[in-house]
């Protein structure tokens, strides 16, 4: 995903989003049904609770079709012009950044015909005050939101200059009566969602969900007569559906997309990918490490990271659509290069080909070219494989470490480095990359295998509620125009809880970051670099790739899509931007 909108937004103490142009539609309905597929491999269940990460609305990324955010941030535009008023028409900071006062849009109705107002917003923030419902990592609130006339004031324990996207852009507003129930029971099933969004549920089946225009929508009539979101098992099946005209908009890695789709009819078939996050290898650092051995040590995690050939992942697993991550800081580069240390120590220090890091960076890190894995593990107290040798300066174990022959494996205290990579088979790119990681690390003396999840639901349920069920996994990042968004997730937010990672220094640096005026770079940059150093040395996550905002679409039915020449919004068919994009499209006559 791509979250680049915040850099220009966070340097101001107040911002009236009502001054920005409202981009909604006044179309007359009648356009043909638009078929959208945000992701593959989701097992449908009739649950549209936006605060249950296992609901079909969450799994498919369709929350904002019904339950809207307060502000729509154009994640490709870091200026105030990229801030679009939605259910809030304005906001401003107070109390040194600890309070955010929202002006709530008037004359809005829910899709059941009832009136929307400030009380619904306040009730929604009571939902995210429950840690079990706070799936997006909204910072801790000091007290309940207060309502005065047409305003709602949110009260936080710490300044929130860095958290606008999470607080205002990813909190999906519920009707107060529903919000009160979800606050008490965050995983309650919502079979028929009530919201203010442009669409409402038309019909549900285990293979297809249909959405119809909300006749009460405050933003005008949606241009589409219907939105269909089908259950598609694999990326290959999505490719077939695009080619046959059974799919108009896909948000996943389509194999050989140009050959298999775009080039068949370049006038209507399109693909545009923008790098907007850091894909990492999650390490299970919960007690027991899911049964893995070795990954509880930072030296082993660093060696794993340095041993991965990221170019192979980018070119083979991602078909060249995503770039190899080049910095162990996990910053999104080159977008965030200004935050890197001036000495160049964390620039291009990761292996992107042939298991060898950039020579200059390797020297700065005191890692001789071609000996990175060897030195890291040897210095960490691990004994090299008995069969190991150096071939043209590159360490090799002498054979694959597969657990059956410890002569090919690094050992320490009678243990070898042993773990599996757990990802959904329907995510063909991740699954291919899991296999590549196994193939790359076994010759380096680590017993690495793959473990399949049969679908997203199986995989996500294991990640969120069964820490003994996985050891490592490939996972996308939260993105962000500023480093804070991903770092918060990794060090203190949802991801940190899932992998079991705690670091007091990281928490302190995040607190300092959130309290710092973004224009005060003399204070800000050293603070961010503390987080970079923690990521680089402790390696709770190994950066792999710069994640693409998957976006493959057909203009045969509708025009007005975001593209490289008109990048008005993160283009992926997912929330929160999905509904915004749908309201900009124009039917082809």
Give residue ranges: language-model regions.
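Aromatic- and charge-enriched surface segment that lines or borders ligand/interaction sites
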Residues: 89-133, 147-153, 238-244, 293-296, ...
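Ligand/substrate-recognition segments at binding pockets and active sites
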Residues: 206, 336, 356-366, 370, ...
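Gly/Pro-rich hinge or "lid" segments in bacterial periplasmic/extracellular proteins
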Residues: 56-57, 74-76, 168-222, 226, ...
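N-terminal lobe/hinge region of extracytoplasmic solute-binding protein
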Residues: 37-95, 194-195
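Detector for C-terminal structural segments
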Residues: 29, 208, 213, 307-351, ...
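Local pocket/hinge segments that shape ligand/substrate recognition
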Residues: 254-403, 497-504, 538-555
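Surface-exposed binding/hinge segments that line
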Residues: 95-96, 101-103, 136-181, 556
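Extracellular/periplasmic solute-recognition and catalytic clefts
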Residues: 128, 134-137, 144-146, 202-212, ...
């Amino acid at each position: 995903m791509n979250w680049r909108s915040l850099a220009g937004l966070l340097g101001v103490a107040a911002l009236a989003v009502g001054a920005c142009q409202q981009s909604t539609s006044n179309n007359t309905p009648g356009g043909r049904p638009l078929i959208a597929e945000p992701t593959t491999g989701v097992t449908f269940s009739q649950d549209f609770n936006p605060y249950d990460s296992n609901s079909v609305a969450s799994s498919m990324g369709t929350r904002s079709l019904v339950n809207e955010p307060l502000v729509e941030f154009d994640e490709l535009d870091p200026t105030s012009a990229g801030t679009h008023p939605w259910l809030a028409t304005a906001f401003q900071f107070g109390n040194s950044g600890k309070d955010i006062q929202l002006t709530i849009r008037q004359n809005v109705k829910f899709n059941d015909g009832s009136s929307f107002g400030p009380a619904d917003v306040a009730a929604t923030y009571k939902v995210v005050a429950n840690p079990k419902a706070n799936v997006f990592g909204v910072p801790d609130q000091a007290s309940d939101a207060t309502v005065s006339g047409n305003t709602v004031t949110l009260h936080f324990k710490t300044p929130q200059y860095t958290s606008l996207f999470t607080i205002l852009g990813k909190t999906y507003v519920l009707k107060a009566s529903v919000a009160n129930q979800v606050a008490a029971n965050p995983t309650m099933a919502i079979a028929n969602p009530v919201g203010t969004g442009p669409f409402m549920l038309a019909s549900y089946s285990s293979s297809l969900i249909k959405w119809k225009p909300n006749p009460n929508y405050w933003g005008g009539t949606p241009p589409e007569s219907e939105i269909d979101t089908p259950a598609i098992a694999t990326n290959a099946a999505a490719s077939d559906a695009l080619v046959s005209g059974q799919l108009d908009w896909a948000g996943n890695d389509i194999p050989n997309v140009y050959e298999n789709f775009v080039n068949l009819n370049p006038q209507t078939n399109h693909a545009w990918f923008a790098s907007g996050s850091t894909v990492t290898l999650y390490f299970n650092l919960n007690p027991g490490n899911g049964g893995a051995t070795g990954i509880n040590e930072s030296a082993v995690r660093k060696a794993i990271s340095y041993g991965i050939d990221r170019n192979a992942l980018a070119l083979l697993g991602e078909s060249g659509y995503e770039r190899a991550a080049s910095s162990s800081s996990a910053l999104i580069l080159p977008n965030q290069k200004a935050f890197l240390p001036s000495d160049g120590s964390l620039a291009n220090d990761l292996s992107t080909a042939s298991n060898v890091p950039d020579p200059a960076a390797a020297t700065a890190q005191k890692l001789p070219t071609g000996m990175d894995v060897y030195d890291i593990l040897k210095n960490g107290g691990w004994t090299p494989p008995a069969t190991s040798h150096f071939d043209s300066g590159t360490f090799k174990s002498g054979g694959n470490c597969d657990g059956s022959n410890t002569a090919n494996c690094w050992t320490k205290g009678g243990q070898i480095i042993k773990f599996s990579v757990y990802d959904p088979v329907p995510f063909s790119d991740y699954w291919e990359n899991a296999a590549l990681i196994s193939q790359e690390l076994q010759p380096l003396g680590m017993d690495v295998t793959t473990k399949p999840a049969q679908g997203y639901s199986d995989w996500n349920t294991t990640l969120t509620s069964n820490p003994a069920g996985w050891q490592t996994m490939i996972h996308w990042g939260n993105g962000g125009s500023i480093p804070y968004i991903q770092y918060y997730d990794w060090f203190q937010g949802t991801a940190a809880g899932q992998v079991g990672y705690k670091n007091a220094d990281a928490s302190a640096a995040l607190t300092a970051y959130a309290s710092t005026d973004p224009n005060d770079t003399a204070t800000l940059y050293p603070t961010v670099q503390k987080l970079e150093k923690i990521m680089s040395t402790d390696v709770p996550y190994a950066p792999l790739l710069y994640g693409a905002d998957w976006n493959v679409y057909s203009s045969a039915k509708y025009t007005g899509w975001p593209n490289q020449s008109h990048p008005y919004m993160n283009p992926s068919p997912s929330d929160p931007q999905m509904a915004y994009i749908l309201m900009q499209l124009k039917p082809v006559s």
